[in-house]
UniProtKB/Swiss-Prot annotation:
Belongs to the ABC transporter superfamily. GO terms for cellular component: plasma membrane; type I protein secretion system complex. Residues 332-568 form the ABC transporter domain. Residues 22-301 form the ABC transmembrane type-1 domain. ATP binds at residues 366-373. The lineage of its organism: Bacteria, Pseudomonadati, Pseudomonadota, Alphaproteobacteria, Hyphomicrobiales. It is found in: Cell inner membrane. GO terms for biological process: protein secretion by the type I secretion system. Signal peptide: none annotated. It is a multi-pass membrane protein. Pfam families: ABC_membrane, ABC_tran. This is Type I secretion system ATP-binding protein PrsD. PANTHER family: ABC TRANSPORTER TRANSMEMBRANE REGION, ATP-BINDING CASSETTE SUB-FAMILY B. It comes from Rhizobium meliloti (strain 1021).
């Protein structure tokens, strides 16, 4: 089965690629529904021909033929079910990579709600529905008129009863859809918020325990869980109510067909076989409707999930990879940069202009909330540039393929996050072609090789989700090695010494100097003065704007001189006050 794999895979194309498989399911459904007539005609022949003739050989032959047809019916049912499972697998093969990339990209491009994993749950919902009995019922529904037509061939009265039953069950299907759609959507939204709250509580377990927040958070959890449970129960109650009503109605309708057939036989207007055959056929005609009602909740959930997936993927289109550019090796240029959070349209950084050549290192300083970390995100393209540009060797970031650019960029975020896996896997960024030499070289560049070797399994030590088995300082130094892996041209470090001791700070300074010595560029967001030891340039940020940029001694002199004057004036005021008291 062909699939539209790759960067440009989209839901519509994935479904088109499955067109032949859906046609195959339709053909299998046609054969299954034709073979469903076996039971009705078997009973008709038994009552109208076999019993009057009292022929045992004819009964045996007819029974063998029925068994053969039932075997074919079962085989086609099996084929149809397996084809639906493989359609679900083909959609997964086609879209799973695109959906994963969208999940990762969405926080950088869109204003997200919930835990950001709704798309993954939506895709699981669609795949689960396609692999179940719901689609088979939908493929059987178009055969309802065919069965009703056969009922008319038996007798117009039986056909009329089947039509009335079909219309009533169709009405129940419509009411089921209308009644469950809104609560199902609310239940999905409430479930997402509940999951986000649970994950946040788990991440902050130490804070919850230390500050005695468990009781209050439990009460809040119970309110959110109650909202989810109530909407879920409402959806189930509506679906189960209409499902039970349709089942009772179908059983009553089947008894009505038996009664009508008996009346027709008594009046001599039909043969005795019509009583049983008509009942079986009517039940079969209406069974897909009842099955559809029973699986309507899954259908509604799958339809809503599919719609959300399409909206997400349409909001995050994937362009073809641009032309491969030469490796950057000359300069970083920031021109009139204005940036802010994704989809917020709110500028946090404005009017930033500077150029750094190979071998240079910039320390970004400024008071809290001055835009230092925001500038780092904008330089890396994590936050969009609403005005201006960031260029490497003259090429704007959007002219690079993100994967290709990533090889030339190292990033140590302020909040370090490692992945579940080994230390070696985290350092090499999970590259399958990574060599031991490159991994060890990155660790040595970050001066963390000896620390790693002291761990139980060295580079093969499993660190758990988020690096939970490591201390904060160890995580930061492993993340620094990850940023230095592959000798990237641009290395951005956001408060890299926040969790480091004196030894770690010395290792950081040496790592910055090693990047500069090989011709790389380092951007260091500094909160402690010690982080500026190995930089030659300083950029001063204040209220989201660049206040100064230039050689370290010059900029620090401009910054520190007013502070020294202010301190001296303060001391003078204190001294004068003491003299006045004396």
């Amino acid at each position: 089965m062909a699939t539209s794999k790759g960067r440009n895979a989209d839901p519509a194309a994935a479904l088109r690629d499955c067109r032949a498989a859906f046609i195959g399911v339709g053909v299998a459904s046609a054969l299954v529904n034709l073979l469903y007539l076996t039971g009705s005609f078997f009973m008709l022949e038994v009552y109208d021909r076999i019993l009057p003739s009292r022929s045992i050989p004819s009964l045996i032959a007819l029974s063998l033929l029925a068994l053969l047809l039932y075997a074919f019916q079962g085989a086609f049912e099996l084929i149809r079910g397996r084809m639906l499972v493989r359609i679900a697998g083909a959609l997964d093969e086609s879209l799973n990579g695109r959906i994963y990339r969208a999940i990762v990209k969405a926080p950088l491009k869109l204003r997200m709600q919930g835990d950001g994993l709704q798309a993954l749950r939506d895709f699981d919902q669609v795949r689960s529905f396609l692999s179940g009995v719901g689609p088979a019922a939908l493929f059987d529904l178009p055969w309802l008129p065919f069965y009703i037509a056969i009922c008319f061939l038996f007798h117009p009265v039986i056909g009329l009863i089947a039509i009335i039953g079909g219309l009533i069950l169709t009405l129940l299907t419509y009411l089921t859809n209308r009644g469950t759609q809104a609560p199902a959507k609310k239940a999905s939204e409430a479930g997402g918020l509940r999951n986000v709250f649970a994950q946040a509580s788990q991440r902050n377990a130490e804070v919850v325990h230390a500050m005695g927040m468990s009781a209050r958070l439990t009460a809040l959890w119970e309110r959110r869980n109650t909202e989810f449970r109530d909407e879920n129960r409402r959806t189930s109650d509506i679906g189960n109510g209409y499902g039970a009503l349709s089942k009772v109605f179908r059983m009553a309708l089947q008894s009505g067909v038996l009664a009508a057939g008996a009346v027709l036989v008594i009046r001599g207007e039909a043969s005795p076989g019509i009583i049983i055959a008509g009942s079986i056929l009517t039940a079969r005609a209406l069974a897909p409707v009842e099955l559809a009602i029973g699986n309507w909740r899954g259908l509604v959930a799958a339809r809503q999930s599919w719609q959300r997936l399409k909206e997400l993927l349409n909001a995050l289109p994937e362009a073809d990879a641009p032309l491969q550019l030469p490796d950057p090796h000359e300069r970083l240029t920031v021109e009139g940069l204005a940036s802010g959070p994704p989809a917020a349209q709110r500028l946090v950084v404005s009017d930033v202009n500077f150029t750094v050549r190979a071998g240079g290192a910039v320390g970004v300083i400024g008071p809290s909330a001055s835009g230092k970390s925001s500038l780092a995100r904008a330089i890396l393209g994590i936050w969009p540039a609403y005005r201006g540009s960031v260029r490497l060797d003259g090429a704007a970031l959007d002219q690079w393929d993100s994967d290709a650019l990533g090889k030339h960029v190292g990033y140590l975020p302020q909040d370090v996050e490692l992945f579940a896996g080994t230390i070696a896997q985290n350092i090499c960024r999970f590259a399958e072609d990574a060599t031991s030499e490159a991994i060890v070289a990155a660790a040595k560049a970050a001066r963390v090789n000896d620390l790693i070797l002291r761990l139980p399994n060295g580079y093969d030590t499993e660190i758990g989700d988020g690096g939970m088995t490591l201390s904060a300082g160890q995580r930061q130094r492993v993340a620094l090695a990850r940023a230095l892996y592959g000798d990237p041209f641009l290395v951005v470090l956001d408060e890299p010494n926040s969790n480091l001791d004196a030894e770690g700070e010395q290792a950081l300074s040496e790592a910055i100097m090693s990047v500069r010595s090989r011709g790389g560029i380092v951007i260091v967001v500094a909160h402690r003065p010690s982080a500026l030891a190995s930089v030659d340039l300083v950029l001063m940020m204040n209220e989201g704007r660049m206040q100064a940029f230039g050689p370290k001694e010059q900029v620090l002199g401009q910054v520190l001189r007013p502070q020294q004057v202010e301190r001296q004036n303060a001391l003078k005021v204190v001294a004068e006050g003491q003299e006045a008291k004396q």
